[in-house]
């Protein structure tokens, strides 16, 4: 904690520092002082008076239900003026079909591919390749 002495205006309008003895300060700021970082009693009393007791907030099921019923995911709030409409990220499917795509994360195949490259073999795919026209349906 850094304590500064108050400034007093002199007759010429310049600022002058008052000595510590004139201010009634009796402790030092060195590390060996037992009062280092201590708060004077007058300040302590003032801090205690300024602190208000915490008010308890009682939450009931009815209050929570009311609160959650007023929440909205839509942009109909007063701070959204005018309402914004968002275009869909993907166009809607015209004729959806059930296709199955078999895919495996290649991260698990990287060590195997490196091992095969060191040996000089060509890696074989873990799944047999299907011709471009073949589609598996469910």
UniProtKB/Swiss-Prot annotation:
Residues 76-79 are annotated as: Interaction with HCFC1. Pfam families: HPIP. The keyword rRNA processing does not apply. Keywords: Cytoplasm, Nucleus. The keyword Iron-sulfur does not apply. This is Host cell factor C1 regulator 1. Interacts with HCFC1. It comes from the Eukaryota. It is found in: Cytoplasm; Nucleus. PANTHER family: HOST CELL FACTOR C1 REGULATOR 1. InterPro entries: HCFC1R1. A motif (Nuclear export signal) lies at residues 110-119.
């Amino acid at each position: 904690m850094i304590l500064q002495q108050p400034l007093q205006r002199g007759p010429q309008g310049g600022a002058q520092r008052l000595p510590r003895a004139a201010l009634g300060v009796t402790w030092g700021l060195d590390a060996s002082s037992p009062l280092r970082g201590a708060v004077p009693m007058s300040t302590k009393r003032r801090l205690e008076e300024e602190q208000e007791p915490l008010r308890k907030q009682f939450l009931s099921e009815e209050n929570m239900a009311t609160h959650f019923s007023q929440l909205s995911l839509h942009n109909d709030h007063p701070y959204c003026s005018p309402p914004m409409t968002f275009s869909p990220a993907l166009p809607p499917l015209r004729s959806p079909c059930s296709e199955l795509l078999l895919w495996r994360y290649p991260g698990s195949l990287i060590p195997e591919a490196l091992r095969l490259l060191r040996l000089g073999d060509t890696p074989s795919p873990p799944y047999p390749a299907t011709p471009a026209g073949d589609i598996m349906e469910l």
